Amino acid sequence: MDISRTEQRILHLMAQGGRIEISRDDDRKIENVSCFTRDGWLYPGVDLDLFRRLKRLKAIKSSGGQPYRITERGLTLVRSQLDNR
């Protein structure tokens, strides 16, 4: 399955240890999505639509109220890239 360039970029970041945190409003609806690198830096470019697409693809998942992490399916979707470290 092909995924877009932005989805690929976020999944690669999450495969290296990144996470997605959400904040909810008073009605328990998701109002804000933030993506953090493994070093704790806020990564721009993740919006609610991209978050929903990744969730629909079952590439990310949250368990026990923890931040969203990449799943095994997400790891198979992401194409390998060279790490700059």
From Swiss-Prot:
Coiled coil: none annotated. It holds the Pfam family YjhX_toxin. InterPro entries: YjhX_toxin. It comes from the Bacteria. Belongs to the UPF0386 family. NCBIfam families: PRK13687.1. This is UPF0386 protein RHECIAT_CH0001945. It comes from Rhizobium etli (strain CIAT 652).
